[in-house]
Structure formats: structure tokens, C-alpha cells
């Protein structure tokens, strides 16, 4: 993802979740995705949607230990 796309997605996530601590960071070796962090902690990955240009998918794992 280029920086313009990262900035747009980051702004959208901050607005949608009402949280200014969300950061979207480029992945140096991956051109089609970016990492998402909350207060410096990795929470998921944003991928460019291959079928829908300009759209993205957010993937977040929730571990059993996180639910305790």
C-alpha cells in the first residue's frame, strides 16, 4: 500500500472506531498490505482487495487469552 492509501485507511479506522491511538504502518516487504497497531501493539493486517480496487480488508485475530 502506498502512503496515501495508508493515510486514508488510518483516518477511516480512527473515525469509525473513535480511537486516535490506531496506527496503520507500511510493511517493507509487502506492497499489498499494512499492519494495524493500537497503542503500539499489533492488532491486525489491512489488505488491498484484489477484486475491488480502492477497497481494503481488515484481518484481526482474537486469541483465547485475550478473552480472559
Model features per residue range: what roles?
Residues 1-68:
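Terminal leader/tail segments of proteins
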Amino acid at each position: 500500500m502506498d502512503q496515501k492509501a495508508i493515510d486514508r485507511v488510518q483516518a477511516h479506522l480512527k473515525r469509525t472506531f473513535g480511537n486516535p491511538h490506531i496506527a496503520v504502518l507500511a510493511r517493507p516487504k509487502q506492497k499489498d498490505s499494512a499492519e494495524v497497531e493500537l497503542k503500539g501493539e499489533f492488532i491486525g493486517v489491512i489488505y488491498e482487495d484484489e477484486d475491488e480496487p480502492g477497497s481494503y480488508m481488515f484481518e484481526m485475530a482474537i486469541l483465547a487469552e485475550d478473552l480472559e
